Every structure is written in structure tokens, then in C-alpha cells.
């Protein structure tokens, strides 16, 4: 089997983990104590779900996951929550003191104490796999644990499991809603450190999700639970092809092959449709053509940027539910003709399609309506460079005054790391710019010199 191991780091990672495993359990008919419910045999017609769950001798199903936080409160909620019997106690790892929103604490001082234990637990999980496919790592960019500890973990995973793919689900700090002043520092330091270790990173911008909750789901004041449930639907769509049988299935490595043209350009933009509340869904048709075209609306994106200003390098459409290839082909053909989608000239209109027959499941009492079909679009577009530019600008404003830097240096970091990380991100912005320029323009430039 092609197993995936999920690693949830820091408060954001763990809370998204809660939402995701709650949804996975519902999707596979697994109850809160890990045993199969009555519907399970109907849903799991084969054993694809074992990519995410391992089965114990007495018929319990345990998530192939580790939750790590450098302070105990968030993971304690899991230990006392509804799904406390789902996880093995050793899968929930906590430290004593937190990283205090400080990358250096997560990566150097406090993180160093926990890393070996975490790797040991991960090793136990990998030993139970027959054909490990890779790791899914959930974390935020802004927190100390999410940024610092994740980057340390990624470095070590690269050492121990060199060839295995590592996919990130990263929470990008929201432009408006900030939880810490030093988010830009942490984000840029962690991006720089993990850039060479991550194969593909799906960024989720909190603010974009807030807006979707407000606009599409009519939630006036979205809570983290609302946000996380929406994020879990997206994670579920991306991983559905690993957990269910379908017509066109997509493997983890296949994502990379189709979405990542150059190793550094590995930040696909995620869009999901339909995001509708139950009241609205009742009155809407939501055909394949409709949900496909709403994927190209900036309103459905998980990161605030404008693809109409950028160019697409690759595009991957993951459908689930009541969808047939013919409808998809018609929908995509329509998009190609009427949309102002610009592909880079060196990559003619490449759409990769995956279809999965399992319709999206919704959490009872959640915000999303139960729909017959949904689509998740992963596109690699140069527009996402806007997100980096915003972050870099904030970094520059603070770093020009060397504000807050002493907290990092005090934890054993060198100031040079800041400028090194910032240069790396400047290079990343430049990479995106170059990828978007047309190849024939460059040839003309060469002749002039």
C-alpha cells in the first residue's frame, strides 16, 4: 500500500489535524473510538483507506499521524476530546514550554529537546508501513513552533527519508488578521529553511478563508473551527484520490510531477468549489460546468492573489462525486475558450484531471452544504508571488529598524540568517518573475549584447 504519514505541528497544525481526522473518520465510516460503523463496508469497497489508517489486531483503526506541539494545552484538548480514543497516546507529543512565537526557539533551543522523540515516533509509524509514500506536514508560517520546529523536522526528515515526498499544508499569515507581530520574520525564516526540503506546499491564507466564510457561508464572525472545517474539506479533496478508488487517481508523486516545473516553484494555488451554505445549495444546480468555472473566480481561492495578473504553469482539477469525464471535458473546453486564462508560452494548456466517485462528506452541524459533486483546483500560477511580495515588504519594514531581532539572537540565532533568508525570498520572487516571462523575449535580449 502507498501509505502517507501526517505530521501536525504547533497549534494551527494540531487544530487543522482535528478537523481533518474528524472528516476522514466520517468519510470512511470510522467511529470516534476507531472501530468501524455500520456504513463502513459500503463506503470502503477496497482497502485504499489504509493509506491513512492502520488497523490493529482487534479491529481498531488508528490514524497514521503524529501531533506535536512544544506546549501542552492544544494537544491536551485532543487527549480529552471526542477523538481521544482514536489516537495512540504516543502519537500525541507535547513539550513543557512553548516557542513563544519565536522561530529561533522552535528551531534551536526548545525544539532541539523534542526533535529526537518526534523522529522516534515517526520512525515507529514508518516501520508499520509496507510502502511509505511520503509525509503530509501541517503547520502555520507565523507561529514559533509552526515555523521553527517544522523547518527543523523537515531537515531531519530529508536526512532520514531522503527520497520520500514531503507535502506541506501551510497557513500563511493573513494580511489583515494577525496573531503575532513577528509573523513576517517567522514566515520568511521558515520558508527559506524548508524551501529545499519541501516538494510541494499548499498555502492557505487565513484571511482568504475568513472572507469565504463570510461571503459564501454567511458566517458573520468566523471562528477557527469554521476555518479549519473548510480547510479540512480541501485537504480531503486533495487526498481523496489516495483514500478512495476512482476513475482517474492521483498519487502524491504525481502531484509534484504535474504541478512543479522547477524545484523551487512548488507553491500551488488551491481553489475549491462549491462553497455554499445549506440554505443556498437547496436552490442551486451546481453543475460540473458551474463549479469548474467558479474555480477561476478569485473568490474561491485559498490565498489572496490575482491569477488574472499572473500566468498559469500547470493546472490540476480534482473532481469528486457525481462527475463523468465527458462533462469535465466540456467544462474545461468552455473555460479555455471564454476565460482570460493565460498559460506561460512554454507550457501549452495543460489541465490534469482526477475524478473520484466518492461525493464530498460534510460534518454534521457544520457550515457547508451536502453537495453531489465538488472540485478542487490546484494551479501553479505566477500570481502567488504577490503573497511573497506582501510578506517580504512587512519583513523589510521591521528589519530596517532591527525590531524584535534581539529575541531571535538571544536564542542562539545569528543576525546573518535574517539577511540570508530575505535574499533567498528575493530570489524566489525573481524566479517567479522569470518563469512568467515569455521565452522568445529572452532570445531577442541576448542578441543585443
From Swiss-Prot:
Mg(2+) binds at residue 71. InterPro entries: Alpha_tubulin, Tub_FtsZ_C, Tubulin, Tubulin/FtsZ-like_C, Tubulin/FtsZ_2-layer-sand-dom, Tubulin/FtsZ_GTPase_sf, Tubulin_C, Tubulin_CS. A motif (MREC motif) lies at residues 1-4. One of its GO terms (cellular component) is acrosomal vesicle. One of its GO terms (molecular function) is hydrolase activity. The active site is at residue 254. GTP binds at residues 11, 71, 140, 144-145, 179, 206, 228. It is found in: Cytoplasm, Cytoskeleton. It catalyses: GTP + H2O = GDP + phosphate + H(+). The keyword Metal-binding applies. GO terms for biological process: microtubule cytoskeleton organization; mitotic cell cycle; spermatid development; spermatogenesis. It is an enzyme of class 3 (hydrolase). Keywords: Cytoplasm, Cytoskeleton, GTP-binding, Hydrolase, Magnesium, Metal-binding, Microtubule, Nucleotide-binding. Its cofactor is Mg(2+). Its EC number is 3.6.5.-. Pfam families: Tubulin, Tubulin_C. Dimer of alpha and beta chains. A typical microtubule is a hollow water-filled tube with an outer diameter of 25 nm and an inner diameter of 15 nM. Alpha-beta heterodimers associate head-to-tail to form protofilaments running lengthwise along the microtubule wall with the beta-tubulin subunit facing the microtubule plus end conferring a structural polarity. Microtubules usually have 13 protofilaments but different protofilament numbers can be found in some organisms and specialized cells. Belongs to the tubulin family. This tubulin does not have a C-terminal tyrosine; however, its C-terminal phenylalanine residue can be cleaved. PANTHER family: TUBULIN (PTHR11588). The MREC motif may be critical for tubulin autoregulation. This is Tubulin alpha-8 chain. The gene is Tuba8.
Amino acid at each position: 500500500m502507498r501509505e502517507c504519514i501526517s505530521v501536525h505541528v504547533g497549534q494551527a497544525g494540531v487544530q487543522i489535524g482535528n478537523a481533518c481526522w474528524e472528516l476522514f473518520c466520517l468519510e470512511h465510516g470510522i467511529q470516534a473510538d476507531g472501530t468501524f460503523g455500520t456504513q463502513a463496508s459500503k463506503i470502503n469497497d477496497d482497502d485504499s483507506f489504509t493509506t491513512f489508517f492502520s488497523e490493529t489486531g482487534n479491529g481498531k483503526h488508528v490514524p497514521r499521524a503524529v501531533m506535536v506541539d512544544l506546549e501542552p494545552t492544544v494537544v491536551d484538548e485532543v487527549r480529552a476530546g471526542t477523538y481521544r480514543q482514536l489516537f495512540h497516546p504516543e502519537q500525541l507529543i507535547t513539550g513543557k514550554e512553548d516557542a513563544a512565537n519565536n522561530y529561533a526557539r522552535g528551531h534551536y533551543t526548545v525544539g532541539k529537546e523534542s526533535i529526537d522523540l518526534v523522529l522516534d515516533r515517526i520512525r515507529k509509524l514508518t516501520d508499520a508501513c509496507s510502502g511509505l509514500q511520503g509525509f503530509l506536514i501541517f503547520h502555520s508560517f507565523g507561529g514559533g513552533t509552526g515555523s521553527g520546529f517544522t523547518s527543523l523536522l523537515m531537515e531531519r526528515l530529508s536526512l532520514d527519508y531522503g527520497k520520500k515526498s514531503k507535502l506541506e499544508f501551510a497557513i500563511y499569515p493573513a494580511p489583515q488578521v494577525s496573531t503575532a507581530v513577528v509573523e513576517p520574520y517567522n514566515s520568511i525564516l521558515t520558508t527559506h529553511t524548508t524551501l529545499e526540503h519541501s516538494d510541494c506546499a499548499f498555502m492557505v491564507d487565513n484571511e482568504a478563508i475568513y472572507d469565504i466564510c463570510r461571503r459564501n457561508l454567511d458566517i458573520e464572525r468566523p471562528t477557527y473551527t469554521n476555518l479549519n472545517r473548510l480547510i479540512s474539506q480541501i485537504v480531503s479533496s486533495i487526498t481523496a484520490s489516495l483514500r478512495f478508488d476512482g476513475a482517474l487517481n492521483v498519487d502524491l508523486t504525481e502531484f509534484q510531477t504535474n504541478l512543479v516545473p522547477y524545484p523551487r516553484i512548488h507553491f500551488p494555488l488551491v481553489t475549491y468549489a462549491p462553497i455554499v451554505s445549506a440554505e443556498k445549495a437547496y436552490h442551486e444546480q451546481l453543475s460540473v460546468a458551474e463549479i469548474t468555472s467558479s474555480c477561476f473566480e478569485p473568490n474561491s481561492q485559498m490565498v489572496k492573489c490575482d491569477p488574472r495578473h499572473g500566468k498559469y504553469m500547470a493546472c490540476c482539477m480534482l473532481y469528486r462525486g457525481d462527475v463523468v469525464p465527458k462533462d469535465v471535458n466540456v467544462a474545461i473546453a468552455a473555460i479555455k475558450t471564454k476565460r482570460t486564462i493565460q498559460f506561460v508560452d512554454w507550457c501549452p494548456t495543460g489541465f490534469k484531471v482526477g475524478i473520484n466517485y466518492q461525493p464530498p462528506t460534510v460534518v454534521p452541524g457544520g457550515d457547508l452544504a451536502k453537495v453531489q459533486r465538488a472540485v478542487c483546483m490546484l494551479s501553479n500560477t505566477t500570481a502567488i508571488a504577490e503573497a511573497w511580495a506582501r510578506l517580504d515588504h512587512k519583513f523589510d519594514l521591521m528589519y530596517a529598524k532591527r525590531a524584535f531581532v534581539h529575541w531571535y539572537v538571544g536564542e542562539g540565532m545569528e543576525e546573518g540568517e535574517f539577511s540570508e533568508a530575505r535574499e533567498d525570498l528575493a530570489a524566489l520572487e525573481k524566479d517567479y518573475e522569470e518563469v512568467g516571462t515569455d521565452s522568445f523575449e529572452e532570445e531577442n535580449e541576448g542578441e543585443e549584447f
